[in-house]
Amino acid sequence: MLVVLLTAALLALSSAQGTDEEVNNAETSDVPADSEQQPVDSGSDPPSADADAENVQEGESAAPANEEPPATSGSEEEQQQQEPTQAENQEPPATSGSEEEQQQQEPTQAENQEPPATSGSEEEQQQQEPTQAEDQQPPATSGSEEEQQQQESTQAENQEPSDSAGEGQETQPEEGNVESPPSSPENSQEQPQQTNPEEKPPAPKTQEEPQHDSGRPKKPLLPFIANLIRERIRKLLARSPLGRRF
């Protein structure tokens, strides 16, 4: 922008100087013409008129010669100076800056693209493969085998007491189906005295069974206790002489 403004100012100055010189030359050319025409009008000799005409022609030829150089010299020299300066201002940045930046960017881009693709990805993959293998192998051997062993042991423990409990339950209903003989008032008085010490031991058995079968639902205790009491009463009646009478 500064270069363009300077060139415009110089052109304006040169045009102004050219117009001033043209005006001065025109004034100088008009003055001798008037001086030469005066003797012609006064009636001078023909040879003097011819000489005046030649002088006028020489003055006219000299005037354009004086007019041309400033117009050509100033503007042409300024234009010739401006052209190389403009070419210098325009060409170097286009060639030097862009080409150098492109040449610098190409190797930097190649360096940025190539190394991570070869070094980073391969090293990370190589590191991830052994770590994944280490993470996968130990739990398969340690955790699963230990859990299976624990489950098998717990299942075996849970099955054994259940079998024993099932056998006891199967035998109980068979005895409960036996009809009890009618009891007399004397037997009714003797029964609570004989059954009180024997009713206490079965209570802890019922409390211990749920401990073995913790995972299974608890069974009602009242019918189980009632069946035990009936069995004890029948056994006592069978042993006592009063029960044999009836």
From Swiss-Prot:
Quick one: a GO biological-process term for this protein? biomineral tissue development
- Choose one Gene Ontology CC annotation of this protein and give it: extracellular region
- Chain spans, region 5 X 23 AA tandem repeats: 67-181
* Gene Ontology molecular function: any one: hydroxyapatite binding
Q: Where is the composition biased (Low complexity)?
A: 39-50, 58-71, 81-93, 104-116, 127-141, 150-159, 178-196
Tissue expression from the record: Submandibular gland acinar cells.
Q: Where in the cell is it found?
A: Secreted
Any idea what this protein is called?
Submandibular gland secretory Glx-rich protein CA
Which regions are annotated as sequence repeats? 67-89, 90-112, 113-135, 136-158, 159-181
Disulfide pairs? Answer: none
